[in-house]
């Protein structure tokens, strides 16, 4: 009895060594995709840390957390409602997202050089990289049904986190420690 070929498999017809690297040549590579992120529909969201403080963009264009009742969230919607664009990912690593805010102009969160800042830009429709400073992987936290974490696609093992600096609770990028770090956990309340 002959085995039936599976639809999601690639048949290889040849192997080549080039500069000490083994390459496989596919019989038909029409359906193969290069690594990229393709933009899907956005969600309007309010992001909170575990102290129930709301993430917002202050006058200095910094992402900070503050105590804020729901009525103030609505009144300050341009600074408190984030646009989370989801992206189709050619690899399976979690839900690929960008985090933007529309305060006068569109700005998108970047972790370039492991420092968070908002770049004045709209997220592009396609990103032809395996890792990018504006793409984060949104994942649920095991054992916490309503908690989310965001891992940088550019810096594996680095997550968005809340850190107290002086009197401010800031959004930062930090390497995850293995001791149940709660500073990297957030709740995301979708508005649409």
UniProtKB/Swiss-Prot annotation:
Which keywords does UniProt give here? Cytokine, Cytoplasm, Inflammatory response, Secreted
User: What Pfam families does the record tag this protein with?
Assistant: IL1
- Marked site (Cleavage) residue numbers: 35-36, 70-71
Which BP terms in the Gene Ontology apply to this protein?
angiogenesis; cellular response to lipopolysaccharide; cytokine-mediated signaling pathway; defense response to Gram-positive bacterium; establishment of skin barrier; extrinsic apoptotic signaling pathway via death domain receptors; immune response; inflammatory response
PTM note says: The pro-IL-18 precursor is processed by CASP1, CASP4 or CASP5 to yield its mature, active form. The pro-IL-18 precursor features autoinhibitory interactions between the propeptide and the post-cleavage-site region, preventing recognition by the IL18R1 receptor. Processing by CASP1, CASP4 or CASP5 induces conformational changes to generate critical receptor-binding sites. The mature form is then secreted and released in the extracellular milieu by passing through the gasdermin-D (GSDMD) pore. In contrast, cleavage by CASP3 inactivates IL18.
Stored InterPro entries: IL-18 (IPR015529), IL-1_fam (IPR000975), IL1/FGF (IPR008996)
Q: Which GO terms describe its cellular component?
A: cytosol; extracellular space
The subcellular location is: Cytoplasm, Cytosol; Secreted
A GO molecular function annotation here is: cytokine activity
Location, primary (coarse class):
cytoplasm
UniProt key word Secreted: yes
Q: Give the protein's biological function.
A: Pro-inflammatory cytokine primarily involved in epithelial barrier repair, polarized T-helper 1 (Th1) cell and natural killer (NK) cell immune responses. Upon binding to IL18R1 and IL18RAP, forms a signaling ternary complex which activates NF-kappa-B, triggering synthesis of inflammatory mediators. Synergizes with IL12/interleukin-12 to induce IFNG synthesis from T-helper 1 (Th1) cells and natural killer (NK) cells.
Q: Summarize subunit and interaction data from the UniProt record for this chain.
A: Forms a ternary complex with ligand-binding receptor subunit IL18R1 and signaling receptor subunit IL18RAP at the plasma membrane. Mature IL18 first binds to IL18R1 forming a low affinity binary complex, which then interacts with IL18RAP to form a high affinity ternary complex that signals inside the cell. Interacts with cargo receptor TMED10; the interaction mediates the translocation from the cytoplasm into the ERGIC (endoplasmic reticulum-Golgi intermediate compartment) and thereby secretion.
Q: Which family does it belong to?
A: Belongs to the IL-1 family.
What's the protein name? Interleukin-18
Originating organism? Sus scrofa
């Amino acid at each position: 009895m002959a085995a039936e070929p599976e639809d999601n498999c690639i048949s290889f017809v040849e192997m080549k060594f080039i500069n000490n690297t083994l390459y496989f040549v596919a019989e038909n590579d029409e359906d193969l995709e290069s690594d990229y992120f393709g933009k899907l529909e956005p969600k309007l969201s309010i992001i909170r840390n575990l102290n129930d403080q709301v993430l917002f963009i202050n006058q200095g264009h910094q992402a900070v957390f503050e105590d804020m009742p729901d009525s103030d969230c609505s009144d300050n919607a341009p600074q408190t409602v984030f646009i989370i664009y989801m992206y189709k990912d050619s690899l399976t690593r979690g839900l690929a997202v960008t985090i933007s805010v529309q305060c006068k102009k569109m700005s998108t969160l970047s972790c370039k050089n492991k420092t968070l800042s908002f770049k004045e830009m709209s997220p592009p429709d396609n990103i032809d990289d395996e890792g990018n400073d504006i793409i984060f992987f949104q994942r649920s936290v095991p054992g916490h049904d309503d908690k989310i974490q965001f891992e940088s696609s550019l810096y594996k093992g680095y997550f968005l986190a809340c850190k107290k600096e002086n009197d401010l609770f800031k959004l930062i990028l930090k390497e995850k420690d293995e001791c149940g770090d709660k500073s990297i956990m957030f709740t995301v309340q979708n508005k649409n």
